[in-house]
Curated annotation (Swiss-Prot):
Protein's organism: Baumannia cicadellinicola subsp. Homalodisca coagulata
Topology relative to the membrane: Multi-pass membrane protein
Protein name (Swiss-Prot/TrEMBL): Protoheme IX farnesyltransferase
EC number per UniProt: 2.5.1.141
CDD domains: PT_UbiA_Cox10
């Protein structure tokens, strides 16, 4: 039974959000880490993201049943109680907000609340089934954890926080569009109006390339603005990011298999954001 409730939290999404949070926190810390604040904020983000994922699963349980990828989720097949999950999400939300309010700062708590509301209330409940632009809204909520990490240290929403928000928003778009192409039939079965369905795969590929270019520019701006200072950051992130762009451009080949290509794009998007978070975390060490 515990395993089923764990599945309802979407562990993969929770883990990726924690990883980006760590990147933002260590970037702002610049080698001077307050381990108590780090641990408490990490737990706060863990509880908030968990709450968001559980609520998302509750709201999406009907469309999850129509999609091959999600049809066996616990809430979709009714193997766990909706009421219990609601209570679970509420408790996680309260604990997360309490930790952030009492041990970090009001800005960090506010960002977490905004991220939760945007993800659950605006993206999942209002826009996901109605608009192709829901992906943009979802990207905002997905970009909040690294900003929380940064602001937990800085206690201000400055240029660094804005750049992190832009970087992770821009990354989410090609990542999500790759999934959309890869799972196109699932989204069609669930009648979700994603870009590849409404505008076509070719247009979606154009968007992917544009967003990756913008992502590359903002990751470089993070260095130009002095928030990262090591040459290792520039070398590693640019190598991986330009390779990601190269893979994106391969999608225009006449003999391209869109399913295989989108799978490669999805996998490489994870490599790109993981390497970015890692290099942000290690930048202060490399800069010594």
């Amino acid at each position: 039974m515990i395993r089923l409730y764990l599945q309802a939290t979407k562990p993969g999404i929770v883990l990726s959000n924690l990883m980006s949070f760590i990147g933002g926190f260590l970037l702002a810390s610049k080698g001077r880490i307050n381990y108590l604040i780090f641990l408490v904020t990490l737990l706060g983000v863990l509880f908030i993201v968990t709450a968001g994922c559980v609520l998302n699963n509750i709201i999406d349980r009907d469309i999850d049943r129509k999609m091959e990828r999600t049809k066996n989720r616990p809430l979709a097949i009714g193997s766990i109680s909706i009421l219990t999950c609601l209570i679970y999400a509420l408790i996680c939300s309260i604990i997360g907000i309490y930790l952030l309010y009492n041990y970090t700062n009001k800005l960090t708590m506010l960002l977490a609340i905004i991220g939760l509301i945007v993800y659950v209330g605006i993206y999942t409940k209002c826009m996901k089934r109605q608009s192709i632009y829901s992906t943009i809204i979802g990207s905002f909520s997905g970009a909040i954890p690294p900003v929380i990490g940064y602001c937990a240290v800085s206690n201000q929403f400055d240029t660094g926080a804005l750049l992190l928000l832009l970087i992770f928003c821009l990354w989410q778009m090609p990542h999500s569009y790759a999934i959309a192409i890869l799972r196109l039939q699932d989204y069609q079965a669930a009648s979700i109006p994603i870009l590849p369905i409404k505008k076509g795969i070719r247009i979606t590929k154009n968007h992917i390339v544009i967003y990756i270019v913008a992502f590359i520019v903002t990751t470089i701006l993070l260095n130009i603005s002095g928030y990262t200072t090591s040459y290792q950051y520039l070398i590693v992130t640019n190598f991986i990011n330009f390779w990601w762009l190269y893979l994106a451009l391969q999608g225009y080949k006449e003999d391209n298999n869109d399913i295989l290509w989108s799978k490669k794009m999805f996998i490489f998007s994870i490599i790109a954001i993981t390497s970015l978070s890692l290099m942000m975390s290690l930048d202060s060490i490399f800069s010594r």
